[in-house]
């Protein structure tokens, strides 16, 4: 694994607590707990301590593992307080409005930080100092959250890939490269495997808590249409859903029961499946030599892939600014990034060589993440940004398309037109700009 570098190609992360319940399903005693003075309302840490408010690693075990990383690498005393996104947003906004900021450092997903941009310090100078870390152009552009200056420093990342039991390679069609799949090749493989095995052996997480909507948002539609929202009902989108309808006929119908793919993959019910890296990691845990992790397929517009990126931000008028900057510098160093990967399965955002002693599953995923980001035509997509409590309603629109097109066989264009109206109704009430891969605009809506 020494040839693995996290340096995505320069192209033309849903809550982690849900995804990483115990490292396998998704993703030391608490450091300085006694002197933290830090509660879920964001109360101040003690003097000389970085009060770190974050949306990440909320389960107790994850939090404790990350506190151990901070204790080892942060180069400053840190009181780490993990809260849900709603508390995070209200705490930052309320303290900023009151002119009484008690935090020093903020950590959250891009979509959680972007709406708070006006309450965050410009970190352009800090990023210039860290230019040697190898943050990609795409990531640096995202840190500007639609403005002209950066509001956070990339912290860690995750994405979605395809897990392959090597037994399925028996049915890989001639000319199809498992490490460079096209959607056409993926469909042909699924059909051949179904025929060869006598049953469908491809699956997807289409259960009640599955993340299949992220497949349509970040992979299928960007790959076929080049967008996610603006292209939602155009001719290319209809082609994408026609494809999805045909693919569904080759997938196991039990997919509608799968909340994650690692369990059906591990028991052999499914041999090939797409999901979040944190929801695949247990599948090859006991026999990594029998597995591959590969990039998602590419389509007519490129290889759409959804990036889950978390960032570190400085609240305006925050406490212990020098120590907070020191912590950011330390947490962007390769060794601390690798330790975060080991402990909580979030991948580095810096260019770094990964050690050869990573666990088999993590090593497999690391290779797939790298290939996916560096592939020709890689097209970065983000989860919805700035929707707040409405994100669930937007995600439901994509789930409705799957339900009505793939399960109920309703006319595709009719479904897209109806759901586009619903999507625009939600977005018009929010008046937010679009997110990648759609172009930045003052108002996001379906064309």
Question: Where are the language model's segments positioned?
Answer:
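Hinge/lid segment of periplasmic solute-binding proteins
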Residues: 109-159, 187, 292-294, 444-447
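Extracytoplasmic/periplasmic substrate-binding proteins
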Residues: 55, 62, 112, 215, ...
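N-terminal secretory signal peptides
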Residues: 1-13, 24-30
